[in-house]
Amino acid sequence: SLSPFLIAKYEVTQAEYAAVMTGHATLSVTPSFFAGDDLPVEQVSLDDLKEPDGFLGRTGLSLPSEAQWEYACRAGSTGPFAGNGLLDDMGWFSENSEVRTHDVGTKQANDFGLHDMHGNVNEWCEDVYSEDFYASELAYGPDPLSTEGFVSRVIRGGYFLANGEDVRSANRESAFPNLRNFSVGFRPVRLPAPLP
């Protein structure tokens, strides 16, 4: 079971990233390989995001756990792809991307109103990658989070060069936390404000 959380409707765009990171002493405000205000920011490592003066520190936001990410992606669906189940309608992948990222929100939203959960760019998650995490009891407790294992971190969603198999709701990948690559961006979460 998951506690309530809020997740961004879109992957963080280059314009949003630049607005938050302006004036940073060492990190680039425009790190992306593909340039465009409404394109997802990429080439931002997990280490960059988590440094004290990084995007997450400056905004007070967090990365989703893998469980939060998959719950948000599926939006109640049980098939391989959310929404109407047709990948071409839901995301950018190898067969329709023209070998590049695309402006966020140009494909259909899933039933939670979230865009680009399939393809465009992979998205960092909070979890340490463990190949057999879902075979453990921890995966089925409240607010599951993998903290044990190798140094690699979970990335989800697939990206614009991935095949259909690799952008499924359930597909899991990993990356070293210092990776800066045009295939990886992020979508933050936060806890809802307490009721008065």
PLM region descriptions:
Residues 1-87, 126-134, 190-196:
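Active-site microenvironments of metalloenzymes and redox enzymes
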Residues 2, 36, 99-101, 109, ...:
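Short coil/loop residues immediately preceding or within conserved phosphate-binding loops
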Residues 3-5, 112, 153, 186:
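Residue-level detector of short, conserved catalytic/binding motifs and their immediate flanks
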Residues 19, 115-117:
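Short, well-structured beta-strand-loop connectors
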Residues 25, 31, 90, 139-144:
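Proline-centered structural pivot motif
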Residues 37-40, 104, 109, 172-178:
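Active-site rim elements
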Residues 77, 97-100, 117-196:
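Surface-exposed recognition segments
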Residues 89-114:
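A short, contiguous structural element within a folded domain that forms the immediate neighborhood
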